[in-house]
């Protein structure tokens, strides 16, 4: 009987301790609400030079002609994360785009054929095509050097259906 009582006391204390810890954690997270914390961030080395070269070459979004440098994105055709060191800095692996078109391209909703004609994913419905100013007659200027990257994008990133 005394053994049972000891076990019950241990269990009771354990349960109380658990409740106190949860309460402590809740209090701590409430105190953190709206606060900031430091984070380690990976930075793409030479991305600024890559962007600068694309801005100097194209001067505007290759699809919609937005030309405010502050709004333009240096978009890798073959994604940066899987490009080798040379491909990451190769200007032929880049297109200059506004943020909306860059996001569509990065997510595979648009791509291009070897002549630069736009390919539009069936997943991009008519309303979003209209809102994003995407039409099947769009065409970008591409060079022979762009084609290997465009082919990669079309095969590995583009969502056809």
Each predicted region: which residue ranges?
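Conserved active-site aspartate in kinases
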Residues: 76
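A detector for short metal-coordination/catalytic motifs
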Residues: 39, 45, 49, 57, ...
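A short mid-domain helix/strand-loop element embedded in enzyme catalytic domains
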Residues: 1-52, 65-72
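Ligand/cofactor pocket segment of small-molecule handling proteins
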Residues: 60
């Amino acid at each position: 009987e005394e053994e049972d009582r000891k076990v019950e006391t241990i269990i009771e204390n354990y349960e109380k301790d658990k409740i106190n810890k949860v309460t402590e954690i809740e209090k701590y997270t409430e105190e953190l609400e709206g606060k900031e914390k430091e984070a380690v961030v990976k930075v793409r080395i030479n991305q600024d030079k890559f962007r600068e070269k694309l801005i100097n070459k194209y001067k505007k979004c290759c699809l919609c002609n937005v030309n405010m440098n502050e709004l333009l994105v240096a978009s890798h055709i073959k994604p940066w994360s899987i490009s080798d060191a040379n491909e990451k800095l190769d200007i032929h692996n880049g297109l200059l785009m506004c943020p909306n078109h860059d996001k569509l391209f990065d997510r595979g909703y648009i791509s291009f054929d070897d002549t630069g004609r736009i390919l539009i994913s069936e997943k991009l419905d008519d309303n979003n095509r209209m809102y994003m100013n995407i039409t099947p007659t769009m065409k970008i200027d591409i060079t022979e050097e762009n084609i290997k990257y465009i082919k990669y994008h079309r095969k590995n990133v583009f969502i056809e259906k």
